[in-house]
Amino acid sequence: MDAAEPGLPPGPEGRKRYSDIFRSLDNLEISLGNVTLEMLAGDPLLSEDPEPDKTPTATVTNEASCWSGPSPEGPVPLTGEELDLRLIRTKGGVDAALEYAKTWSRYAKELLAWTEKRASYELEFAKSTMKIAEAGKVSIQQQSHMPLQYIYTLFLEHDLSLGTLAMETVAQQKRDYYQPLAAKRTEIEKWRKEFKEQWMKEQKRMNEAVQALRRAQLQYVQRSEDLRARSQGSPEDSAPQASPGPSKQQERRRRSREEAQAKAQEAEALYQACVREANARQQDLEIAKQRIVSHVRKLVFQGDEVLRRVTLSLFGLRGAQAERGPRAFAALAECCAPFEPGQRYQEFVRALRPEAPPPPPPAFSFQEFLPSLNSSPLDIRKKLSGPLPPRLDENSAEPGPWEDPGTGWRWQGTPGPTPGSDVDSVGGGSESRSLDSPTSSPGAGTRQLVKASSTGTESSDDFEERDPDLGDGLENGLGSPFGKWTLSSAAQTHQLRRLRGPAKCRECEAFMVSGTECEECFLTCHKRCLETLLILCGHRRLPARTPLFGVDFLQLPRDFPEEVPFVVTKCTAEIEHRALDVQGIYRVSGSRVRVERLCQAFENGRALVELSGNSPHDVSSVLKRFLQELTEPVIPFHLYDAFISLAKTLHADPGDDPGTPSPSPEVIRSLKTLLVQLPDSNYNTLRHLVAHLFRVAARFMENKMSANNLGIVFGPTLLRPPDGPRAASAIPVTCLLDSGHQAQLVEFLIVHYEQIFGMDELPQATEPPPQDSSPAPGPLTTSSQPPPPHLDPDSQPPVLASDPGPDPQHHSTLEQHPTATPTEIPTPQSDQREDVAEDTKDGGGEVSSQGPEDSLLGTQSRGHFSRQPVKYPRGGVRPVTHQLSSLALVASKLCEETPITSVPRGSLRGRGPSPAAASPEGSPLRRTPLPKHFEITQETARLLSKLDSEAVPRATCCPDVQPEEAEDHL
């Protein structure tokens, strides 16, 4: 566009005018109000604008003159019609106007977001300031005769008033600034979208009309050319024909010309219609352009007007809020200037009432030691270890009386704390409270403050460390200092005192500031949680919480690697103690809340959890949940296929039918071979669980839980398919069939427990085996029972509450033989050893290969039952355990037998399946406590056979050789 365009003056003056118009238009776009030229020229608020001039050719002088209003040399601002005309004549002017409206809307949105966020921060700051001002005002007013107290009270009141003013300003700003500007922005955005849609529709119609016009013009030209070509004809056609009548060819040409002429006329009419349509669309587009540009200009001016109005309102509100601060601080400074240091302290001293000076404290004197004739050294030490005299109180008018009648210092105290005591106000330690301030201890009457050590019933700390709301331990009938609270059986085992610092409750896992803790195990607990506490006192520091559920089986805490997890032993012992006759045990689920509480107690207290007060179904649910949430089951994943393959070979074997034939030795041998491959802890745990389920199934008539039912419950728990891609791609029918095989395998383990694992963990027999009145000890014993426990009293394991008592016949035998040695007392084990020894003698020194119950290792009697963690050796042949009375004879006989492969005593399982371990005649894979015995290997037997010939009669004639003599002999 040049200066010769219509509507602009020609020549250099026109070009200068054109530049001035552009500069004025840019100035108008960034202005803040829609006012007349006079208001824009005389408004002092808009005299300067921080935005620079956008004209690249403008100088610094021109930029300064642009924002100072119109000047005689500067450009004249354009009117609204001139702005619209300028945009209409500019290419893309409508799109530019709509884009400016969009930018204005985005700009207003950013302003609204900034002001809203700033207002929220100011509101939060005002609330926090008012909160701390209220608290500080209350604290300051509680003191008396403090310097500048009135000034700081006014300061805090000023903060409160400023906070209130800030909240009012934020509310007023939302009404006067945010809401009008947001409403105008929404209106502008709505109309902008509407105008943009109209403009796009008009442009689309115009484009369609232009395209139709071009197609009609092309068609008109083509048909006109066709008509012209057909109308001209050839020279032969113009010559007269010889024949008088028209020919057929001439007739066809005539019809073709007429048809071409008709098409040309039709194309001409269509072309003229398209021209008229295009002209109409062009006029509509111009009208729409003028209308849209005009409306956009009005919307922008209205938005600027609203923005200007709300901005002035915002500045007014902020100015009014900011003016109160300097004036108030200036007034506070004027009030603080005349203050003199020490003025309030003088008023405080004058307010005190002088009193008579207190009497001087009594002087201490040396008391010579005078021993008594009837007193023992222990009494003298007790006298010398008496408590120190109480500290004198500065506020008391007379000191507390004390005397020394010869038994140590004594004092008479008064109940309740002394008013104004420094110990009570400052909160001294337990040592100073117990020794220096006798009046701070609860209770009444005379009391000796003796610092005694902890004895399990009273704390070694001061009485004030106890909670005063819980009463005195001496006044409680139960002997507990918590008579006011209901304590569980587990809570009664703790020595509780007041909590000294913030900690976490071991019962509810909640953070607490005030509560109780145990003096011995340092267990922390809420007072309200003492009623439901399940963790017993272990008389040593309680370990940190350990996750037990959902972890790897080998990562569980144990005393030694082969130990059965304490969760399993604890739950099974409790169920066997009082729940073997409960109907539906392991089938009926417990309460979810109580089960969660028990699981949490196990993780917090480990084996110190008290289960006697819980429902048997809750305990069984905890055991099932523990086994189900293991990352790898008791039977590892890599042995799953082998066990399932073995289970598929088993036939349905109803365990309740007494006439059911025993399984084939091959099945037992294969199962033992698989069990040998289990890790030590897994094997012990599986054996313990199967033994427990055997006892549960034995009470089928009472609890209605047969071996089949228990197999259904524990099959998918003990034997789970492996996780991973293989499990994801498994066929559902196969998984369903495997569940049946899992239950069948567990049922088979329960029914045939005696043949698979042995008799070590079976319950006591109802009728003990008969005993002979005077049995004679045989020369050789194959029992793996340990020696009598009285030989080493320190090695006896503690007897659990759920363990069965000793054999009554055994006690009667002990009474009948009060002077007999342990080897002479007839017991069921000695009878069994006699039978095995006789069989050995009859066989010429060869051990008979019979069933598992008659093998060389033998089996435990039904009277033997123990839940102590033991090591069960597997695989190989054990060393022969013999009597001391026939040591030489056994050695001479063993020299003639086949070599015996010895297994180390510390080995829990063989390195691989051996023939002796795989055969049913070999070891039954029992894991029993190893007794103190002598191991006869091939080399030892060879050496013993070379002893002097006199050693054989001496060993034969002396069946009652003591163990010490035998050891010396060896």
Curated annotation (Swiss-Prot):
Chain segments annotated as transmembrane: none
Q: Which InterPro entries match?
A: AH/BAR_dom_sf, C1-like_sf, F_BAR, GMIP/FCHO2-like_FCH, PE/DAG-bd, Rho_GTPase_activation_prot, RhoGAP, RhoGAP_dom
Question: What are the Basic and acidic residues biased-composition ranges?
Answer: 831-844
Span of domain Rho-GAP? 554-757
CDD domains linked to this entry? C1_GMIP-like, RhoGAP_GMIP_PARG1
Q: Name one GO biological process term.
A: negative regulation of small GTPase mediated signal transduction
Q: Name one GO molecular function term.
A: GTPase activator activity
| Positions of modified residues (Phosphothreonine) | 660
Q: Where are the zinc fingers (Phorbol-ester/DAG-type)?
A: 493-537
Biased amino acid composition, Pro residues: 766-778
Q: Which residues carry this modification: Phosphoserine?
A: 19, 71, 231, 234, 243, 437, 441, 885, 907, 914, 919, 923
* Positions of the F-BAR domain: 81-344
**Region annotated Disordered, chain positions:** 44-76, 224-263, 377-478, 762-878, 897-932
Stretches of Polar residues bias are at 56-65, 231-246, 815-830, 847-863
The protein's job, in short, is: Stimulates, in vitro and in vivo, the GTPase activity of RhoA.
User: PANTHER family from the xrefs?
Assistant: GEM-INTERACTING PROTEIN (PTHR15228:SF16), SPERMATHECAL PHYSIOLOGY VARIANT (PTHR15228)
Q: How does it assemble?
A: Interacts with GEM through its N-terminal.
Q: What is this protein called?
A: GEM-interacting protein
Native organism is Homo sapiens (Human)
